[in-house]
Amino acid sequence: TERDWTLLVQGVDLHDDRVAALMQQFRFIPDARLDDVMISYATEGGGVGPHFDSYDVFLLQAHGQRRWRIGRQKDLSLVPDMPLKILANFKPEHDWVLNPGDMLYLPPRYAHDGIAQGECMTYSVGFRVPQTGDLARELLVRLSEGAEEAAGGDLYKDATQPAVAKPAAMPEGLAEFAKSALQKALKDPKALQRALGEYLTEPKANVWFEMGDMPDKLKSVRLDRRSKMMYDNHHIFLNGESWRAAGQDASLMRRLADCRELTDVELKKASSEALSLLMEWCDDGWVHPAD
């Protein structure tokens, strides 16, 4: 076996039920923060090099040994002209060798360097850390879809506008009108909650679902391992879409989101509308019969 090689495979939880089950063990942290499981296979001496990530990560040693050197340093300058973001001045403060079953947690921007000691495999459980700019852009795009209806159809009026000597100057009244239009578009607090939930449950670009088999009657159901389901006080979110929910059906759907399955006893409490929606999700491949 050649030395100093590393193979990284991202999003393995989307393709393997066993890895998806491993990721479920980390749901003591909200699903809104869960991202994916990456598997790193390396031969003797293999590693990415000293670097840092912009997100929290748990490093679980699955096979063999890997030596980790880590440090919380302020100097995050990078080696120039490198395809990978490698730290130019890495200064480790701690040094550990992880054996199978050992795990290391690293917060964002914590410098680290992992080197295989013999053939090894490491599972990296990563967590998403939304950035304000990205989050604002995504939410504004989603909010814009209902902005026209929310803001209404009032027309700008300037009947008292006097003649001007500087025609290129922006009228203050028009600026205030624009500000008022934006405030009206955002006046519904549930609109922001809906946009956030849809964004957080949007499947990744490399995820697609195949149409499922439609059972004659649902006895029990489970979420597809690739499905993202969350909820707030007023909505249910699944794979980038949202539904208003209340009462017994809301409790049932929240349990599906938390437990990722519903038993036959629980399904007997569902209304005809909820059962119809579950059948629709089965057809989409988002949910599957569990029996």
Predicted regions and their residues:
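Acidic, low-complexity/disordered tracts enriched in E/D and polar residues
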Residues: 183-257, 279, 290-291
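C-terminal amphipathic alpha-helical segment
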Residues: 140-216
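Short amphipathic alpha-helical interaction segments
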Residues: 268-283
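Active-site region of the double-stranded beta-helix
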Residues: 1-102, 110, 115-155
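Residue-level recognition of conserved beta-strand edge/terminus positions
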Residues: 105-107, 290
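Short acidic, hydrophobic short linear motifs in intrinsically disordered regions
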Residues: 252-270
